[in-house]
């Protein structure tokens, strides 16, 4: 698989709509606060749906500003980001974060 990772999700997704670049997936920052993003979450979701490629979300916890449960259920319920990459700093964080991820994404099938 050939993927593209970006720190500017909205700009990159809109660029992909105009280019001939054939990629299999996109990895981008996404969270309900819009932190580490170049547009609003709503605009980014719209762009994700237009591009129609599988998305891996990163920075979904907004560098710890959001609780794992709230952040992960928000992303999962959107239905357009079926995979997330999660950063953790301790065993306690890992247990809390991955438990929330399993609950939020259980039954979801990656696009």
Language model region names:
Residues 1-111:
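Beta/alpha (TIM)-barrel catalytic core signal, keyed to glycine-rich beta->alpha loops juxtaposed to Asp/Glu
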């Amino acid at each position: 698989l050939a993927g593209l990772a970006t720190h500017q999700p909205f700009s990159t997704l809109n660029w992909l709509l105009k280019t001939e670049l054939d990629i299999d997936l996109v990895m981008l920052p996404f969270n309900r606060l819009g932190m580490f993003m170049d547009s609003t979450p709503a605009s980014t979701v719209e762009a994700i749906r237009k591009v129609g490629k599988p998305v891996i979300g990163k920075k979904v916890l907004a560098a710890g500003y959001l609780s794992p449960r709230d952040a992960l259920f928000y992303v999962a319920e959107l239905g357009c980001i079926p995979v997330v990459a999660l950063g953790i700093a301790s065993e306690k964080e890992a247990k809390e974060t991955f438990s929330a991820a399993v609950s939020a994404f259980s039954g979801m099938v990656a696009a």
